Amino acid sequence: MTAILGRGTCGAHLTLLFTVEDASADPVEQGSLGTGICVEDGIEAIARGQAGEPRLSIRFIDDVGDTRLYQQVLDLLYEEVDAAKSMQWELAVRMHLPISQGFGMSAAGAVAAACAFQRALGLPHEESLRRAFSIAHRVERANSTGLGDVAALAAGGIERRIAPGAPYSGTQLTRGPGIAQGWSEATPVVLAWRENPGRHTSEYIDHPDWKRLISEAGSTQMSSLSAGGWDSSRWQDLIDSAQTFSRDSRLIDDASRGILVEAGTNAAERAGFAG
């Protein structure tokens, strides 16, 4: 029996500042305003399908992950693509960055997997990509693993999110309601993380006190970052706003972030990279 194969990749996303916009009951309209950086390293997924009763077998290469997330992606794909339901699927997932370290890996994994399944089915690239972002956003909101990572990844580069929500939605996969803009710069990035995983995202975005602190600090910074053009001339504005946000939201003082930042700063100074 002939097997079909598809590959999907998606880079990670580093949030620099954000708000929590979850008042709507519709997950498509939930999200965040904010800014961040998309990087090339993230997740690669290879999907293999054969005709048969629908099921999914998942294998993680060199790491561990959340099997439930990938089943949720496929379940949503079943609702939109009938051909996916007539397949026995195998999914191999390779992670190039750790999970639960603030790199938006759940969003990246959902996008990569959704793309892999659809490419295996031979669906057009643009349609597949839009549907992947749409599905990934809904999975993220269902699990409270993220707010704006998917919209950010859809924009790419150094991004700002100026309207909350999924980047694509509806049967025609039209743009919105989320709006994000990005500009790209081929810049090497050094990523650092703690040995042990940090708090789950839901511990912040679902907690009323954290939600208030984060949203107030994020809204203040986005009032200026949302105005005007968005290109490399805004880099210093972005860095200054991110530092102010981390202090005003008190996130810098939580989960030993300040210690990690200090260690990174000291390492940069020793290497002669500190500005």
Language model: regions and residue ranges:
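DPxDG-like acidic metal-binding loop motif
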Residues: 103-126
